[in-house]
Amino acid sequence: MNTSHSDYPFDLGTHCPAFVVTNDEAAAWFATGLSWLYGFNHEEAIGCFRHAARADDGFALAWWGIAISSGPFMNKPWEWLTMPEKEQALAACHGAIAEAMSRTANAPPEARALIEALAVRYPQTEVPDDGVLASWERAYADAMIPVYEAYGDDPDIAALYIDSQIMLTPWQIYDVDKRAPNPEAREREIQAALERSLAGTGADHIGVLHFDIHVQEMSPTPEKALPSARRLQELAPPDAGHLQHMPSHIHALVGDFDEATRCSRLSMATDKRFMANLHRTPFYRTLVCHDVHMLMFAGMQTGNLADAADAAIVMAEILENVLVHRPVTHMDMTLEGYYATIAHVDVRFGRWQQIADREFAGDPAFMPVSHAMHHQARAVALAALGRHDEADMAAADFDAARARVPAGYAYFNNQADDILAVGAAMMRGEMAYHAGETEAGFDWLREAVAAEDRLVYTEPRAWMHPPRHALGALLLEQGRIDEARVIYERDLGHEEELPVSRQNRGNVWSLSGLAECYEKLGDPRAGDAGAALAAALPLADQPVTSSCFCRGRAGGSGTA
């Protein structure tokens, strides 16, 4: 079907690479497709590139766009795909790049170089083992080096080169715990390309800005990407929801949850306009959920129940009638993981009775992690209410549900069982504490902290309620003020003890706990801590007098 670009309902801006040579209609479709590509909506990008190919049968880059959009990217690497998904992707990629290669005779040199480089990434339609697929990624990254050397001043060439190098170690450019580059990553080359491009025209390029945020967020210095985050807030196209969301990654890491919330609200409003199209872009649903997840996280970190609860409601709406079969693909598991985060909201805000009264809505076979999270939350709530026998039964239900989660089940970038290990230790810690087994409770909560610290980086967090907040609150309740002080200082990043991505800078809960510790210790830093807390409290819509609602007399409502 031939559709005029003027009738397309979404505004993705008008940026078109300087090396695109075609008619106006094809160029408009190509520009829109490329913006969707930079915004990780590959499925919609494919449709736009197909329109470009129909508008100009000799337009080689349109077929390049189809090929690159049909293949792996940061949020969908080869190793996350099932065999049928790999077969479908490779057939599409190989076929499209062959079409592009057949049209390069009159293509500009930059376009021809991009097409020839991408061709080495998809040399056949038969799916090999993962080792060979990885070698194809290396071959493509290597092929992009001379392209970048020749044309790297062009921001689109720079963005595509940076992406090719990132894809050698997606989400693993840095070793978070060692606070150093992963030896397998081309970190030096990536950073050099980013610095060069950001010093030039890349400073106004949505792809370069997007990739800069992703690279720096995993580094020891995420604040380095603040200029890119702020510029992307200004430049993200009106209908590119994920690009509007992306600055929130950096804002959250540096503790600016007001800006993270603002980005999240904007992206969610944009995503709402696109929702009717999710039937044709099923993978993009994961990105829409991700944007909502960030608002949930920001609300939980600021003590704003309205924001967190709104996000939970929207998350449930997005996933309505979606989680209706056994999860098979990584996408299935990711969507189910997003649904599972909803259970964390009521725990964070101590809504114990609501949790205790709630029955699980859904089929446990289709929602195994959500089912386990439901029982974990009930055990914590019942223990806080002093209903210890019922808490024991809920804990047994959690153990049974956890055991039924299939081996290898993914939960974002982590294994589901590693996430549930945090919940198990946190649950048993609070249960033991409220049952009067104080030391056992602290031991379990320290194990929860250690389990959370072992998780693979993901932003926002897969486990939404930091165990340090519970541990610090209950240590304070027992008068162990100096121990609590250390917990809060580490959580807020006041010490070098924790990598940045394991800190919770600027969160109102630890600010409250640390201010209380300093005041009780007579610490001269009490004034500064109180001022920091006073600055954070206006974002909260709930009283915050402790870092966890689990603090308080067993059987009571708890305090925070």
Over which residues does each language-model region extend?
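Short coil/linker segments at helix-helix boundaries
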Residues: 2-58, 63-153, 160-204, 209-219, ...
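TPR-repeat structural position
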Residues: 42, 187, 222, 257, ...
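Single-residue signature of alpha-solenoid repeat helices
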Residues: 45, 93, 140, 190, ...
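TPR/TPR-like (Sel1-like) alpha-helical repeat modules
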Residues: 60, 67-72, 83-102, 252, ...
